Amino acid sequence: MLQLSISHIIVLSLLIRIGFFLFGLYQDKYMTVKYTDIDYVVFSDAANYVYNGYSPYSRETYRYTPLLAWMLIPNCWGGQWSNFGKYIFMISDLITGIIILKLLSGISIAGKKLSTNKIIMLSSIWLLNPMVITISTRGSSESVLTVMIMLSLYYLINKKSIIASGFWLGLSIHFKIYPVIYLPSIMLYLSTSGTPFIDVPIVRWVNRTNIKFLITTLITIGAFNGIMYSIYGYEFLYNSYLYHLIRIDHRHNFSVYNVALYYKSALSEIAEASLGFFTGNMEKFVMLPQLSISALILPLLFARRDLISCIFIQTFAFVTFNKVITSQYFIWFLIFLPHYLAQSKLYSNKHMMKGIVALLLWIVSQGSWLYFAYQLEFLGISTFDNGLLFSSFFFYISNCWILSVFIDDLNNDL
């Protein structure tokens, strides 16, 4: 029987990514529906503006840090250089998988390290996952972000380097703001790593170690944001951060708020004002339960018990309650799933069926939404009132139940 090693799985994952990339070139050239993500076109256009001495925000719908456009300047050099960004994203995707392998190799359960077979099986959730591979080879930049986040955890857990970990988390928050929800978790995790300044309830969680981490993270965020603001001014702040607080995106959106925001986007200012303060500002208020659960309650419950598993559940909750959800967002929590399953009872024979039901429910609820979205986008059939509305609720309720399973599992209540 063929025995795979960790080196084999890395080489295999690289070859599969190359295969997907080459197929994408063929599909873009010969098929009606293109393989390359529209976001990659936006990134490339923004890079072209930078290359010619203009702001990346001259490209409408570019809502990212200028760093991304700077990274993709070689896209403008013509020929195969137009795929430079995809090479970066594929390499970042692979590096993320390698860091996952390293973190798994450091796990001990009852004093025993994970077996090589288990490490390979768990890391395959990322390295051999067709959804992960498709997203990076189509030209999504999420893998650049996942490298930063995983480097932060690697330096924190494996290397015990507070400054390096804080730097990478700060850079990831600059790159895309949502990783800020990990800051409370890491602060709580580090609360046991030093002598508290004052030994009184709650305040005793603050010590030299987590203050050092916090300061490093904030300095990194401030430095990168300060540089970008000095170059691009308010348009950087608005497009990179403020826009996402008021964003309304009714296409390709699994969110339970999808249909409501779609109809709201069609209202005149007068009609919108008549909705009342809360309903008229729905896109702002939906963040309250989302952040309360993902950035406050879950860290308080689980951060000191198992940091990466806590971050996994945080991210799953954040995506579930987000006002915009696309398939790319699933990448945000998939990077932590191998670590979570390594110590989860859902991976055991006794509870595996519950895990399988959760997986099937997650897939089926997505499939039902995609079916009605396909009818709307490609067949021109209006499915907003019935199909998309109910399938969005189905997806939301399914995710809430799955979240409760994860919480019970980590809380030893299965």
Swiss-Prot record:
Coiled coil in keyword set: no
GO BP annotation list: fungal-type cell wall organization; GPI anchor biosynthetic process
Membrane topology: Multi-pass membrane protein
A GO CC annotation given for this chain: glycosylphosphatidylinositol-mannosyltransferase I complex
GO molecular function: alpha-1,4-mannosyltransferase activity; glycolipid mannosyltransferase activity
Stretches that traverse the bilayer: 6-26, 87-107, 119-139, 149-171, 183-203, 213-233, 282-302, 316-336, 356-376, 387-407
UniProt keyword list: Cell wall biogenesis/degradation, Endoplasmic reticulum, Glycosyltransferase, GPI-anchor biosynthesis, Membrane, Transferase, Transmembrane, Transmembrane helix
E.C. designation(s): 2.4.1.-
Enzyme type, top EC level: transferase
Keyword Endoplasmic reticulum on entry: yes
Subcellular location(s) per record: Endoplasmic reticulum membrane
Pfam families on file: Mannosyl_trans
InterPro entries to which the protein is assigned, alphabetical: PIG-M
Pathway named in the protein's UniProt entry: Glycolipid biosynthesis; glycosylphosphatidylinositol-anchor biosynthesis
Family stated for the protein in its record: Belongs to the PIGM family.
Its biological purpose: Mannosyltransferase involved in glycosylphosphatidylinositol-anchor biosynthesis. Transfers the first alpha-1,4-mannose to GlcN-acyl-PI during GPI precursor assembly. Required for cell wall integrity.
Name of the molecule in the record: GPI mannosyltransferase 1
Organism: Debaryomyces hansenii (strain ATCC 36239 / CBS 767 / BCRC 21394 / JCM 1990 / NBRC 0083 / IGC 2968)
Gene designation per UniProt: GPI14
